From Swiss-Prot:
Source organism: Thermus thermophilus (strain ATCC BAA-163 / DSM 7039 / HB27)
Keywords: ATP-binding, Chaperone, Cytoplasm, Isomerase, Nucleotide-binding
Residue numbers binding ATP: 29-32, 50, 86-90, 413, 480-482, 496
Pfam families linked to this entry: Cpn60_TCP1 (PF00118)
Top-level taxonomy: Bacteria, Thermotogati, Deinococcota, Deinococci, Thermales
Localisation per UniProt entry: Cytoplasm
GO process terms (BP): protein refolding
Gene name of the encoded protein: groEL
Catalytic activity: ATP + H2O + a folded polypeptide = ADP + phosphate + an unfolded polypeptide
Summary of the function given for this chain in its UniProt record: Together with its co-chaperonin GroES, plays an essential role in assisting protein folding. The GroEL-GroES system forms a nano-cage that allows encapsulation of the non-native substrate proteins and provides a physical environment optimized to promote and accelerate protein folding.
First-level EC class: isomerase
GO cellular component, one term: cytoplasm
Subunit structure: Forms a cylinder of 14 subunits composed of two heptameric rings stacked back-to-back. Interacts with the co-chaperonin GroES.
MF-aspect GO terms: ATP binding; ATP-dependent protein folding chaperone; isomerase activity; unfolded protein binding
UniProt protein name: Chaperonin GroEL
Region (Disordered), start-end ranges: 524-543
Amino acid sequence: MAKILVFDEAARRALERGVNAVANAVKVTLGPRGRNVVLEKKFGSPTITKDGVTVAKEVELEDHLENIGAQLLKEVASKTNDVAGDGTTTATVLAQAIVREGLKNVAAGANPLALKRGIEKAVEAAVEKIKALAIPVEDRKAIEEVATISANDPEVGKLIADAMEKVGKEGIITVEESKSLETELKFVEGYQFDKGYISPYFVTNPETMEAVLEDAFILIVEKKVSNVRELLPILEQVAQTGKPLLIIAEDVEGEALATLVVNKLRGTLSVAAVKAPGFGDRRKEMLKDIAAVTGGTVISEELGFKLENATLSMLGRAERVRITKDETTIVGGKGKKEDIEARINGIKKELETTDSEYAREKLQERLAKLAGGVAVIRVGAATETELKEKKHRFEDALNATRAAVEEGIVPGGGVTLLRAISAVEELIKKLEGDEATGAKIVRRALEEPARQIAENAGYEGSVIVQQILAETKNPRYGFNAATGEFVDMVEAGIVDPAKVTRSALQNAASIGALILTTEAVVAEKPEKKESTPASAGAGDMDF
């Protein structure tokens, strides 16, 4: 396959065009007056969204070189989303500004590596300032404000605050689609552990890459399963019931895994397999915890149970099992309350006698899993398009709220990034040459989110930014784009999680500096396909 090679300025400019294509589509969604973006779907109705990462994921450019730039910017959005769960649009806007200002300087003869060092030092200074401005999130009011801002919707904020109040800040909260028009909060007993599906072929929803099993049997095996003959008797028994099956084992491999995948793909049996959580003796105990929660029995040869002799009565049951690539949540386990309480009491006794800090931490984790429940937010809407958009906003808001609990909140609306400018300006005085220029690139980029929020609301961005910067006494002073007033952002409830703001800046600078130091791009050469006269009048078209 022939390749295209592009060097120096031409390579960087091609990447910049790709970056701009994604950023221009994404940045219109920023802020309370952010505009909608309509996404065409191959099947079904179009999606209308204000979520930056959703828009970014949809962009594929025809030009191979530009598409590489677009993919790099998508990486900024998805990385920020993975770390903090929100802030994707802010990260995109920052990255675009760093690339734009940086390439101007590289074209004028600046040393890209010195610029990169300057950018990194400036980001470090800005991050310290963000941490200094952070306010810890203690009460319900602060949690509600963060969720409301993230979703642009007070109803979302209230429900997430209710959910966190019920299950605690460390509790498990899941967002599901409701069959009705109403959005409701339900509290369900549940058990979650950090192991995902062994094979992606077990996925039932390719869009979210999740496997969901409703009213499932749960087979809990202590050993590694590789021999399919051991597994077949119980598989046949479950297949006759027509119910799905979750297998939790040390590992499932070889012909046993192949058999499960083939049965799943053929539709003979809805099945998923996950590795057991923990290691050694702790794994044995956690499997017993899961057995207590689901009302099953651990199939262990130590206890005299063999897998080939397993019966349906030994299997656990659960209303719903949700498995992602990283974790498994068992909701509505059919275990007896007294069995679960016996496990909890046993762990409490162990806690009293243990001296090891590590063992204590792990025991408390097990206790939380057994004692805690799952808060389920069931999202309802009139149409499928609205439902998907609303569910997405709930997920975003939930992630933002968790990030806020972790690292605190800062004034929103791009104000915190503007306040970080003073730290960067102090740093610029200590730097010289192209390193100082690199820091100035970050200084200019820090204005961009506030400017964009104002412009999306129909105001002149640069005027708003200057007015905020002119107020030096109150670091929380900023512009409420929803009402068009200048206010104390924290008092007005316009706050962002510090983690989101920090991650957005760090990821944007990382990709921005990468593009500035690019000297060559290698891309696939597009194939010229022969035109085929598929239908009358179509002979001149490329297919």
